[in-house]
C-alpha cells in the first residue's frame, strides 16, 4: 500500500490529508476521496510518503482519474507558494485556481489537439482556382501557406469546410496536429495587423524582444491612444510565431466582445483559449485544459487566469 498527501477543498491548517492507494499516484492527479461521510475531489500533492499516523486509520482513495493528464509540478509549486505567501490553506488555494469542471466528481474528457490544414504535394501540383472565384482562390492560397486551423480558414472563406472536404476526397489535403501557427496578413483577415509601428513603438517592441527567453518585466507608458496596444500585439506576434504561448491578462471590465474580436482578427490562425467568469463552465474547463496541454497558444483571461498551467509560456501581458 502507498500513502499520499492529497489537497482537498476544506478549511484545515494546510488542506492536505493522507490517503492510501494500491499504487503510487503521480502528483497533480485528480482523485476522489472520502471526507466526512461524503465523496470529494482531491489533487495528489505528495506521493509515496511515510505516514506519521496509525495506518489502520488511513482511508483509501476511491477513484483516480488516470486518463486525465495530471496537473504539472510547476503548477503545484506555484500554488504551494501562493498558499504560503497568503497564509491560506493549500487545499483551498488549489481549488480556487481550478475551473469548475475539475472540481466536480465526474471524469473530464481531455480535449483533442487542433488540426492544421494544408495542400499536400499532389494538391500543390494542381491548377489553382481561377482568380475570378476570389474566395475560393483565397482559400487555396491559404492552404498553400499551410499551418491554419479550420476556424481561421473559415474567416478566409465561409465555405472552407465543404471545399476542403471536396479537395480531401481528391487526395489534395493533409492535416497535422499541433503545428506551429504561421502569423500572416491575409486578404484582410489579418492575424498580423497592417498597422506600422512608429519609431518609438518599434523601439519599445525591439527592447521587449531582447528579453525573450528570460524573465524581464517591462512597463509600457503612454497616454490613451498612443499605441501601447500595437506594441504588445507586435511582441505577442513574435512569440506566437516561435510556437510558444502567450498569456494576455485583462481586468474583467476590459474583456469586452469588441476587444476579443480585435484579438481574434489579429491572431486569427492562432489556437486561443478564453478564461473568464462569464463563460460556460464546460467551455472554460476545456479551454483551461487546452492551455495546459499546450494546444492553445494564446490564452486570454482575467486575473485568475494567471494560475493556468502553461507548459511553454514565452510572454505575459498584463
Segments predicted by a language model, with ranges:
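Accessory, non-ATPase domains that flank or precede helicase/AAA+ motor cores in DNA-metabolism machines
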Residues: 1-318
